[in-house]
Amino acid sequence: MHCPFCRHSDSRVIDSRETDEGQAIRRRRSCPECGRRFTTVETAVVAVVKRSGVTEPFSRGKVIRGVRRACQGRQVDDDALNLLAQQVEDTVRAAGLPEVPSHEVGLAILGPLRELDEVAYLRFASVYRSFSSADDFEREIEALRAHRRVSTSR
């Protein structure tokens, strides 16, 4: 690790701690050349494999932008979107795989979004599952109603 102050090519780790609920490691480092200290944060990169085969790092921001589009005009605040994105990231990381298909990210979005806002869920699902007719919407609405009945009967 290069020192950010003197650019020396070596540093010594003084302390390491888990942060972000175990998703990252915070390391306190010392430069043997200039003696200054600095902090690094290390995270494992989860890559998303798109349908085209292109691989890109998982992005909470991209999840939020996609869900925000589905929530347009709905009473959904930024905190709820951030929490949903965190849930999606946790689900993706829990798979324990270095690469996750974009399809799995979409599936990870559907569950929390259904709980957050049913209309936004229908909008997102209609694009994600490529609805082509009103029948597709009717089937999904019936599945939502069945899910609601099961949830309320508990």
Swiss-Prot record:
Record has Nucleus as a keyword: no
Free-text comment on the cofactor: Binds 1 zinc ion.
Positions of the ATP-cone domain: 46-136
Zinc finger regions, unnamed: 3-34
Family matches, as InterPro entries: ATP-cone_dom (IPR005144), NrdR-like_N (IPR055173), RNR_NrdR-like (IPR003796)
UniProt keyword tRNA processing present: no
Cofactor names: Zn(2+)
Keywords recorded for this protein, A-Z: ATP-binding, DNA-binding, Metal-binding, Nucleotide-binding, Repressor, Transcription, Transcription regulation, Zinc, Zinc-finger
GO MF term list: ATP binding; DNA binding; zinc ion binding
GO biological process: negative regulation of DNA-templated transcription
Function (record text): Negatively regulates transcription of bacterial ribonucleotide reductase nrd genes and operons by binding to NrdR-boxes.
Family note: Belongs to the NrdR family.
Protein name per the record: Transcriptional repressor NrdR
The organism of origin for this protein: Mycobacterium leprae (strain TN)
